[in-house]
Amino acid sequence: MASLFRSYLPAIWLLLSQLLRESLAAELRGCGPRFGKHLLSYCPMPEKTFTTTPGGWLLESGRPKEMVSTSNNKDGQALGTTSEFIPNLSPELKKPLSEGQPSLKKIILSRKKRSGRHRFDPFCCEVICDDGTSVKLCT
């Protein structure tokens, strides 16, 4: 009897997960075609909004930022002027990162790989539509 139950358990689990996905899709369709425009969202973090994109959902955070120009030039002119004032700086350190210092490039890439793995935390939002229906979305 127990083996019969174990054989049906994966099928039951798949069926239930499919029903949950269908109900979530039905609730999202209930918000209407202008889902991204007519939407209030209540999230644990401030100023989170959902917008629709051709590729799917996009979670945006905060207000749009202004593009601020920095003192660095595209050609690396600022790096050249600062390294000229340091007399005992080796020529390898004066080169831009793209040309020299392959060991430093490896350190930076490995640090990005390590930090990228542990950054993902589950994030949930309750999305409230204009008609009062709500959907809980988790990443």
Swiss-Prot record:
Tissue distribution of the protein: Expressed in placenta, uterus and in fetal perichondrium. Expression levels were increased in both early placentas and molar pregnancies and were reduced in choriocarcinoma cells.
Cysteine pairs bridged by disulfides in the record: C31-C125, C43-C138, C124-C129
Coiled-coil ranges (or none): none
GO terms for cellular component: extracellular space
Entries under PROSITE patterns matching the protein: INSULIN (PS00262)
Keyword Ribosomal protein carried by entry: no
Compartments, record wording: Secreted
Domain of life where this protein originates: Eukaryota
Function in brief: May play an important role in trophoblast development and in the regulation of bone formation.
Protein known as: Early placenta insulin-like peptide
Biological source species: Homo sapiens
